[in-house]
Amino acid sequence: MLPLSLLKTAQGHPMLVELKNGETYNGHLVNCDTWMNIHLREVICTSKDGDRFWRMPECYIRGNTIKYLRVPDEVIDKVQEEKTRTDRKPPGVGRGRGRGVDDGGARGRGRGTSMGKMGGNRGAGRGRG
C-alpha cells in the first residue's frame, strides 16, 4: 500500500500529523499532493511539550516537515479492499488496447513486409540498379 494512495483515500477523515519539531496537528484531511503537503480543516495544534493548544479553522503543512501520520483504521481497511478488488480483475481488462497476441494482421508501421524483398520491387523507394 502506497502512502499517497492511503492519503487520497483518507480525504474527509480525521487524522493526526506529528511534525519533526514535535508539534501535533489534529484535523480533517482536505487534500494532499504528490509531495505529501497536507491541507487540514478544523485543526487543533498542540505544542511540543503538550501544554499549549491552538484551534485553527484550517492549516497547510509542508510534506518534508512531517514525521508521521495517524489515520483511522477504517481508511486502511478501505484501501486494502480497493486493492483486492483491482487485483481480482481478469488480465487485460481495463488496461487499454495493449499489444496483444499475433492475429495475423498488419504489424506496425515499418517499410513493408518480407514479401517485398522476395518478390519484384513494387512500391515505394528507388531500389538499386
UniProtKB/Swiss-Prot annotation:
Q: Which domain of life is it from?
A: Eukaryota
Q: Please describe what happens when the gene is knocked out.
A: Severe developmental retardation leading to plant death.
Return the InterPro entries for the record.
Lsm4 (IPR034101), LSm4/Sm_D1/D3 (IPR027141), LSM_dom_sf (IPR010920), Sm (IPR047575), Sm_dom_euk/arc (IPR001163)
Molecular-function GO terms, alphabetical: RNA binding
Gly residues bias located where?
Answer: 111-129
Can you give the residue ranges of the Sm domain? 2-75
Q: Which UniProt keywords apply?
A: Cytoplasm, mRNA processing, mRNA splicing, Nucleus, Ribonucleoprotein, RNA-binding, Spliceosome
Q: Which SMART domains does its entry note?
A: Sm
Q: How is it modified after translation?
A: Methylated by PMRT15/SKB1 in response to salt stress or abscisic acid (ABA) treatment.
Among the entry's GO cellular component annotations, what is one? cytosol
User: Found in which tissues?
Assistant: Expressed in roots, leaves, stems, flowers and siliques.
> Where is region (Disordered) located?
79-129
Name the principal localization, coarsely classed.
cytoplasm
- Entry keyword Lyase: no
Among Pfam families, the record links this protein to:
LSM
Q: Which GO terms describe its biological process?
A: deadenylation-dependent decapping of nuclear-transcribed mRNA; mRNA splicing, via spliceosome
**Residue spans of biased composition, Basic and acidic residues class:** 79-90
Show the CDD domains listed in the entry.
LSm4
Tell me the function of this protein.
Component of LSM protein complexes, which are involved in RNA processing. Component of the cytoplasmic LSM1-LSM7 complex which is involved in mRNA degradation by promoting decapping and leading to accurate 5'-3' mRNA decay. The cytoplasmic LSM1-LSM7 complex regulates developmental gene expression by the decapping of specific development-related transcripts. Component of the nuclear LSM2-LSM8 complex which is involved splicing nuclear mRNAs.
* Family statement: Belongs to the snRNP Sm proteins family.
How does the annotation summarize its subunit structure?
A: Component of the heptameric LSM1-LSM7 complex that forms a seven-membered ring structure with a donut shape. The LSM subunits are arranged in the order LSM1, LSM2, LSM3, LSM6, LSM5, LSM7 and LSM4. LSM4 subunit interacts only with its two neighboring subunits, LSM1A or LSM1B and LSM7. Component of the heptameric LSM2-LSM8 complex that forms a seven-membered ring structure with a donut shape. The LSM subunits are arranged in the order LSM8, LSM2, LSM3, LSM6, LSM5, LSM7 and LSM4. LSM4 subunit interacts only with its two neighboring subunits, LSM8 and LSM7.
Fetch the PANTHER family from UniProt: SMALL NUCLEAR RIBONUCLEOPROTEIN SM (PTHR23338)
> Per its record, how is this protein called by name?
Sm-like protein LSM4
In which organism is this protein found?
Answer: Arabidopsis thaliana (Mouse-ear cress)
